[in-house]
Amino acid sequence: TTELIRAIAQKFGVQVYNVLTGFKFIADIVRRNEDKGEFICGGEESYGFNVGQFVRDKDAPISCAMVAECAAWAAEQGKTLYQLMQDIYAEFGYYKESLTSLVRKGKAGVEEIAAIMADMRDNPPKELAGSPVTKVVDYNKPEETGLPKSNVLQFFNEAGDVVSVRPSGTEPKI
């Protein structure tokens, strides 16, 4: 989702768990760790977010309440939410994420998506944005990730960039 979460959590000594995409995986982490500490929040790349342990799924009302609370706190400091984000970037660095989807419909689309994933596994890129790839993580190999098997690949380069590739589980896209 974003490594900015990890950077902020690290400053405050808060444990971060990486899970597969989907709130069922976030809810599972909450369930398995209920007796070990407080769950603060969880989020995923589709902008779903959850705060606290009450609702173990995407929770738009609490997310809106948290944004309102952040805005109120920022106003008390004489700042806007934008200025607060600039403060965060100044302290932790700027993180940029983007999502690109390729839609491939029908049976031919399913086959093309499978072929793209197979090719990415067999012929991983040597560079990302001109920087050498230093690590490839294949989520089809639970022994590499400690997570359930999933059709996901991640490529890391020397510059610190990360590219994740996965077919959607609900739509005809990769």
Report each predicted region and the residues it spans:
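Generic C-terminus detector
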Residues: 172-174
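Phosphate-binding and adjacent anionic-ligand microenvironments
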Residues: 1-169
